[in-house]
């Protein structure tokens, strides 16, 4: 490509592409002022960009302009089994479509390496107090997901460039951090920065290593898999200067929850953050990963740390080879990615955050950016009066206490802190409350090894925190069934029940249908709440219990010291543990076995895997942006959990009724997430969240919460799925009207697929979350944005209207939303077309990512 900039990398047998020379040739001295992100993007352009547009693309970075799109070519795609599987189902369906049109299906393969980790499908049916919980939960997972795992095994053997980590081995982001990311790639004699996109919003976990890794929707991931560039405009790059040091007893969880609140207020949505300064340098890689992981919770696209000695120490600790560690340091220093080469980097905005200001924190209820200092529990109305009656759960009962999520279990300090608190509690005779479903689900098998090395796993097990899985579990809503007696008591007494978890999201209804609210906390606090059993407990002030001598025990009495935590981490976490876990795991991955047939033999009765419908039926017909009726009128902060929930399927839901008709017993309904490879089940999850507030669903004069819609012009309120079926039968084009921050949360492609299959042509909102907006475009749904000061309320939209969209769809063009009111009034409202790039216009005009690829593939085949 741009071979003039290919040069030998000193001290190695490899070459590299000299982005500094390319940038300084345009603007002498400019490279030294570029932020870390810009340097990595510049290298990607110099190595991969068409020479004809290289100079203009680099000028966008050098001059901090956002006037034109430039290409970005990620080195890898990482997927979990839910979105990864649905992406591969789409590619399998694409092979069918290509074959039916006379093309060669075997030529449809990912061009970019794809790593799929099965981590989202295990539910914690057996809690950590069952010594056989891990084996039982895995057996249930295999039984429930046989169809899915059969398909995933076929993809490994049929597609090129697809590696699969089977279930029971850990969480995608933690494996990416501990093993899969080399930080610096070496391929075809060239060294270059590792970059990746992942089908999960927490993909920035490995930004802690200095790797640009961003979450994308499944549809955008498919686009990258198939070899297309990810076109972008220069993002807002914000410097975050970390000063000071943590106070004693403060965990990385406390820090990230404080940062999440701070950064939300600073409005960093969509930005690439670069954490720098003495405070950043003092953080371990595990602490950095906890911070980077929660980028989507504070709204950022990426959360970068620079490569430095902490990075190389971590690479050694996790068993990377000496040669790889040396390459990382050599390349980073040569290419200006080492921390001390970025002293003169300039930012459009720099924020300052003092680590010493952080206190012990939780977050909640309902939002991860709703910081809750543990010293303010009573003042905030969380802690309060409660009484424990024999045989009854208290108000605010903690029914789930889960040490879960890569956010915290990839940080040895957090895990060891929880284990030491458990040890101290056991020594004082404290126990878990019987109604608390406790669990430990690390994101890596290495966690088990270092807990055993420290002789601390038995201490966690004694309190009910035995290992239930190496998977996402409770963090992504797979908390499993409650004890039937506990569930019945919650229903009979209409009890306010809660969950406390070391995860990254706590939206209402996400963790468990019967946990009305959830709170995020550090792993040691999770253990403490399992002991007290209610969120009404003032964790800093109240007495947890009494020891064998009758002496009161408080949290400070059992909280471990930083010195002890650090000493045990230093003595118990070892490189050989990571090698023992990952060397055999990746040896098995490399052995894909015999090649399978290029076309999948779809199972007609499967409710998990079904040939997708995107090239046939209504989606293949003419589209219209006229006469659209609203399916829903929604407020602010609609999440992808509202749009397409992931948690357990209940028997009285539309999906539950369908599965029962298909012959599945209720105990094997599984979660909505696991059925996303079957559109007939998955589309019944559209707007199926019981906490949805559709402002059109007015019953007895008031808006009724639930999965409800009002069919117009009839005016009948009914269940959302029945309304969708009614409109589908009428071939009625639909629109959704919404408030600010539409589509926040998980990077869930079915949040877009579901509305498209329902017949929704347009979403008009006050603002969109980045990943969901690209997913809508990838499905051929048009995102439009109200102008500031205009919204559904100022326009008096009540759902009886019909809507047209008028105007030429070009990047960020002004279009007209025409409202036809029931009384005959016509109102024209200017809106912004949120097709932001020419590439997005091309995808939308083709009907979506897959439709465009099929067209392009057949055209190129015919030309050849």
Where is each model-derived feature located?
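N-terminal amphipathic, basic-rich helices that act as targeting or association modules
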Residues: 1-139, 283-293, 297-321, 604-644, ...
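Mobile "lid/hinge" segments at catalytic clefts and subdomain interfaces of large enzymes
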Residues: 37, 184-329, 338, 422-434, ...
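Long, structured ligand/cofactor-binding scaffold of large enzymes
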Residues: 50-242, 254-257, 360-363, 377-471, ...
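Terminal amphipathic helices with adjacent charged low-complexity linkers/tails
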Residues: 73, 92-147, 280-385, 540-601, ...
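Extracellular/luminal Protease-associated
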Residues: 243, 272, 276-283, 504, ...
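Acidic, glycine-rich flexible loop/linker segments
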Residues: 547-562, 568, 772-843
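NTP/phosphate- and nucleic-acid-binding module
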Residues: 674-675, 683-717, 725-729, 784, ...
């Amino acid at each position: 490509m741009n071979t003039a900039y290919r040069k030998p990398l000193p001290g190695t047998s490899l070459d590299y592409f000299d982005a500094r020379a390319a940038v300084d040739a345009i603007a002498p001295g400019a490279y030294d002022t570029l932020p870390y992100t810009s340097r990595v993007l510049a290298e990607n352009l110099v190595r991969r960009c068409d020479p004809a547009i290289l100079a203009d693309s680099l000028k966008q970075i050098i001059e901090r302009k956002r006037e034109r799109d430039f290409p970005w070519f990620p080195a890898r795609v990482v997927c979990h089994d839910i979105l990864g599987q649905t992406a591969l189902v789409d590619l399998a369906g694409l092979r069918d479509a290509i074959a039916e049109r006379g093309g060669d299906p075997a030529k449809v393969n990912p061009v970019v390496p794809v790593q799929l980790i099965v981590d989202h499908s295990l539910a914690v049916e057996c809690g950590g107090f069952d010594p056989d919980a891990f084996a039982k939960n895995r057996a249930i997972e295999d039984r429930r997901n046989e169809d899915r795992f059969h398909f995933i095994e076929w993809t490994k053997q049929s597609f090129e460039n697809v590696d699969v980590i089977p279930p029971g081995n850990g969480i995608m982001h933690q494996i990416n951090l501990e093993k899969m990311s080399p930080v610096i790639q070496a391929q075809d004699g060239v060294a270059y920065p590792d970059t990746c996109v992942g089908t999960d919003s927490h993909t920035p976990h490995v930004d802690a290593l200095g790797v640009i890794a961003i979450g994308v929707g499944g549809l955008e991931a498919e686009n990258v898999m198939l070899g297309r560039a990810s076109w972008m405009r220069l993002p807002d790059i914000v410097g975050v200067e970390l000063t000071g040091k943590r106070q004693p007893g403060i965990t990385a969880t406390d820090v990230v929850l404080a940062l999440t609140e701070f950064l939300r207020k600073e409005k960093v949505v969509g930005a690439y953050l670069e954490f720098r300064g003495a405070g950043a340098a003092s953080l371990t890689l595990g602490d950095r990963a906890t911070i980077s992981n929660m980028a989507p919770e504070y709204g950022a696209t990426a959360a970068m740390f620079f490569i430095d000695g902490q990075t190389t120490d971590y690479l050694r600790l996790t068993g990377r080879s000496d040669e790889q560690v040396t390459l990382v340091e050599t390349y980073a220093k040569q290419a200006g990615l080492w921390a001390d080469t970025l002293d003169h980097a300039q930012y459009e905005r720099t924020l300052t955050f003092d680590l010493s200001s952080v206190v012990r924190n939780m977050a909640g209820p309902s939002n991860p950016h709703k910081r809750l200092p543990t010293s303010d529990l009573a003042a905030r109305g969380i802690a309060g009066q409660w009484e424990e009656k024999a045989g009854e759960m208290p108000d605010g009962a903690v029914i789930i206490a889960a040490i879960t999520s890569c956010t915290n279990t990839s940080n040895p300090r957090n895990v060891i802190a929880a284990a030491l608190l458990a040890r101290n509690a056991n020594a004082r005779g404290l126990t878990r409350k019987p109604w608390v479903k406790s669990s430990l689900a690390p994101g890596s098998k290495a966690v088990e090894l270092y807990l055993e090395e420290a002789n601390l796993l038995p201490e966690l097990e004694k309190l009910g925190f035995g290992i239930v899985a190496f998977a996402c579990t409770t963090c992504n809503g797979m908390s499993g069934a409650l004890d039937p007696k506990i569930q019945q008591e919650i229903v009979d007494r209409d009890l306010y029940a809660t969950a406390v978890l070391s995860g990254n999201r706590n939206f209402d209804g996400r963790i468990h249908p019967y946990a009305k609210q959830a709170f995020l906390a550090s792993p040691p606090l999770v253990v403490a709440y399992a002991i007290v059993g209610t969120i009404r407990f003032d964790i800093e002030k109240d007495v947890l219990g009494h020891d064998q001598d009758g002496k009161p025990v408080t949290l400070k009495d059992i909280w471990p010291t930083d010195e002890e935590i650090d000493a045990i981490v230093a003595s118990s976490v070892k490189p050989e543990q990571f090698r023992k876990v990952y060397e055999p795991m990746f040896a098995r991955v490399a052995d894909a076995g015999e090649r399978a047939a290029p076309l999948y033999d779809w199972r007609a009765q499967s409710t998990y895997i079904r040939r997708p419908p995107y090239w046939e039926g209504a989606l293949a017909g003419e589209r219209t942006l006229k006469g659209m009726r609203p399916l829903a009128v929604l407020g602010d902060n609609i999440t992808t959990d509202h749009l397409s929930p992931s948690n357990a399927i209940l028997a009285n839901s539309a999906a539950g009724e369908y599965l029962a008709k298909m012959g599945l017993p209720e105990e094997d309904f599984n979660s909505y997430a696991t059925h996303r490879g079957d559109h007939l089940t998955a589309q019944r999850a559209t707007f199926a969240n019981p906490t949805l507030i559709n402002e059109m669903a007015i019953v007895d004069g008031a808006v009724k919460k639930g999965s409800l819609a009002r069919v117009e012009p009839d005016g009948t309120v009914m269940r959302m799925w029945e309304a969708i079926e009614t409109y589908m039968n009428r071939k009625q084009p639909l629109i959704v009207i919404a408030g600010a921050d539409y589509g926040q949360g998980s990077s869930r492609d079915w949040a877009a697929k579901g509305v498209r299959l329902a017949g929704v042509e347009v979403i008009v909102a006050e603002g969109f979350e980045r990943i969901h907006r690209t997913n809508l475009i990838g499905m051929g749904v048009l995102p439009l944005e109200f102008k500031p000061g205009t919204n559904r309320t100022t326009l008096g939209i009540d759902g009886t209207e019909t809507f047209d969209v008028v105007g030429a769809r070009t990047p960020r063009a002004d279009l007209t939303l025409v409202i036809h009111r029931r009384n005959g009034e016509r109102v024209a409202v200017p809106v912004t077309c949120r097709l932001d790039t020419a590439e997005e216009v091309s995808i939308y005009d083709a009907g979506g990512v897959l439709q465009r690829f099929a067209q392009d593939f057949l055209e190129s085949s015919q030309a050849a």
